[in-house]
Design a protein with these regions (language model features):
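Long beta-strand-rich cores associated with HINT superfamily self-processing modules
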Residues: 1-109
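Intrinsically disordered, low-complexity acidic/polar and Pro/Ser/Thr-rich regulatory regions
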Residues: 108-142
């Protein structure tokens, strides 16, 4: 889960550049959201898994999204399992509108960040990427 949409693409690019990771497939549901409004970036990657006697490549799915996208996806997932709701199309329409509002919020937050970055001394792209990779390493080791 990332703070901003551009972080998603930077992270996906950084993962794809890893020597021990092979990208099998990518789906960009941010540029082409699902019909219900779902937005996220999916990658199927092959990663080495180390066993006591061998190393085996395994396919795993990585889903990268913003905090706002994750909020929507989590609630939509819970709500879609509620059965026997009258006027379900109304619910679907409302969820889709919420997804559009969240996408708009993501864009606005990105603009706020850019404004702030332009007014202060910024870390280099290399420093930003290193910090993102450090966070990934911490998250995978927890």
């Amino acid at each position: 889960v990332c703070s901003y949409v551009d972080d998603i693409y930077e992270l996906a690019q950084a993962l794809a550049k890893q020597d021990d990771i092979t990208v099998i497939r990518e789906k960009d549901y941010i540029k082409k959201p699902k019909e219900n409004g779902y937005r996220s970036y999916h990658m199927i990657v092959s990663v080495p898994v180390f066993f006591s006697d061998q190393t085996k490549d395994m396919a795993v799915e990585v889903q990268i999204r913003t905090i706002a996208m994750d909020f929507w996806a989590s609630l939509e997932h819970q709500l879609k399992y509620k059965k026997d709701i009258p006027n379900q199309q109304s619910i679907v329409d409302q969820l889709s509108r919420c997804a559009q509002q969240i996408a708009s919020l993501d864009r606005q937050m990105y603009q706020v960040r850019r404004q702030i970055e332009m007014s202060e001394d910024l870390p280099t792209e290399e420093e930003i990427l290193f910090e993102k990779l450090r966070r990934i390493d911490i998250a995978t080791n927890e």
